Amino acid sequence: MIEMKILIVEDNPQMRQLIRAVVSDLAEAISECADGEEAVAAYAAQQLGAEDRVLMDLQMPGVGGLEATRRIRAAFPDAQIIIVTQFDDQHWRRAASEAGACGYVLKENLLELRQMLIGR
């Protein structure tokens, strides 16, 4: 286990469960949010730091992943946010990078997410 906390931000409960299963042995604590608004509040409340990771979906009801990433990074510049999405598109990758994401992984490649977390 790596000494980090993971915050999973995903509106689909089954996908949240799948992501949790893939990364569960890599973190000392895992929490979940269903939208970007919850994620911004949870990041501050849990006092997450540079050693921790946020796994953020892009499209969610209410505040989406890009806006939540911008808000978290504005308040916490050291926040490490990895986008986990179904969109394999340069537009989304560029937008995620501009919002402050440090990584971008497709949901179909969750083993790549594990490698990214291990190699942090």
Predicted segments, located by residue:
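Acidic, metal-coordinating helix/loop segments flanking the phosphotransfer/catalytic sites
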Residues: 32-53
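Short amphipathic alpha-helix used as the core "switch/output" element in two-component signaling
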Residues: 41, 66-77
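Alpha4 helix (beta4-alpha4-beta5 surface) of REC/receiver domains from two-component response regulators
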Residues: 67, 88-104, 111, 115
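Acidic catalytic/metal-coordinating carboxylates
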Residues: 35-38, 63-67
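Conserved acidic carboxylate
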Residues: 10
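Active-site residues of response regulator receiver
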Residues: 57, 85
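Receiver (REC) domain active-site loop signature in two-component systems and cognate sites
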Residues: 60
